[in-house]
Design a protein with these regions (language model features):
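Amphipathic alpha-helical and helix-coil boundary elements used as assembly
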Residues: 1-204
Length: 204
């Protein structure tokens, strides 16, 4: 008979953080980065998260305005050139704020790879203040493995630390196979961005 293709759309538990838009103000400039994240997360019972961003004072008024908690934390962390990375392998909310400092216990050195450069992102970072970024730091490796790791994970590849930027999972001969895109830490920096909806709004 004819083969059938089943298409599924799935979300991990961090979707719970991306539903309700909220307004709130963090007024204490002495509040640390970690405390702010913890304040946002305190309503999500059972959540698990790790923060790999220096616990420095936020230094200014920080406003969440008509943003979900996920949107707000992503924007807030962009100030420190870092990102949120969700762990899709857990049933409850789990994420890492910033890249993991702990390498996974896998060896992918023998795997075939595809080497490439993301020139658009390279130029964008260079012209927006990250002029120390080199061409080699912008290199990307693409490897396929049956090991399961999450976005943001660190892997020692060919003797150097690399980080999983994205993954595509496919079924091959009944086995789950993942195609990983690896970047160096510098190539995964994000540029700060702002909530345009705040412009012109009176904050009481």
């Amino acid at each position: 008979g004819e083969g059938k293709i089943l298409v599924l759309t799935a979300w991990d538990a961090t979707m719970q953080m991306d539903i309700q838009r909220k307004k709130r103000i963090f007024q204490n400039p002495e509040m640390g980065v970690h405390q702010l994240v913890s304040e946002v997360m305190k309503t999500y019972i059972g959540s698990d998260y790790k923060i790999h961003v220096p616990d420095v004072p936020i230094g200014q008024l920080v406003v969440q305005y008509e943003e979900t908690d996920w949107e707000f934390l992503k924007r807030f962390l962009s100030k420190y050139n870092e990102m949120l990375y969700s762990d899709t392998t857990f049933p409850d909310i789990r994420f890492e704020a910033g890249l993991s400092p702990h390498p996974e216990a896998y060896c992918w050195d023998a795997l075939p790879f595809v080497l490439s450069q993301d020139l658009d992102k390279f130029v964008e970072l260079k012209v927006n203040g990250m002029d120390q970024l080199t061409g080699s730091q912008n290199t990307m490796f693409e490897v396929a493995s049956y090991d399961v790791v999450t976005i943001g994970s660190q892997v020692i590849y060919k003797g150097s630390p690399w980080f999983v930027e994205s993954t595509e999972r496919i079924m091959e001969n009944g086995l789950l196979k993942s195609v990983y895109r690896l970047r160096q830490r510098e190539g995964l920096k994000v540029l700060p961005y702002f909530n345009q909806n705040i412009t012109g709004v009176s904050i009481d």
